[in-house]
């Protein structure tokens, strides 16, 4: 089973979350968003129990093998590099600045 972490849970992060839920043999393990503390109702609506405001918790989680980077454009490169160094498979929204 492919275990996924989503970084950034705005509009596009939510779209990817819904898409991943439809794929057999995949599971979203955790979500990170810098505004996570203010999004508890949103996470409850989507059935997300494991969330953080620190993307490093996704990167450093040994259960997660794939990271979806759905954060603002200016954060893509930093997060993608950290995910690659951690040996994660990466799906990154464009562009990468």
Label each residue range with its predicted role.
Residues 1-46:
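N-terminal Rossmann-like dinucleotide-binding module
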Residues 46-97:
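Beta-loop-alpha module in the N-terminal Rossmann-like domain of NAD(P)-dependent dehydrogenases
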């Amino acid at each position: 089973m492919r275990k996924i972490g989503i970084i950034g849970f705005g509009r596009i992060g939510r779209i990817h979350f819904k898409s991943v839920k439809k794929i057999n043999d995949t599971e979203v393990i955790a979500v990170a968003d810098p505004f996570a503390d203010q999004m508890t109702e949103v996470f409850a609506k989507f059935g997300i129990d494991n969330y953080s405001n620190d993307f490093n918790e996704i990167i450093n989680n040994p259960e997660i093998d794939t990271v979806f980077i759905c954060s603002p454009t200016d954060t893509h490169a930093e997060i993608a590099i950290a995910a690659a160094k951690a040996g994660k498979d990466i799906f990154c929204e464009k562009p990468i600045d």
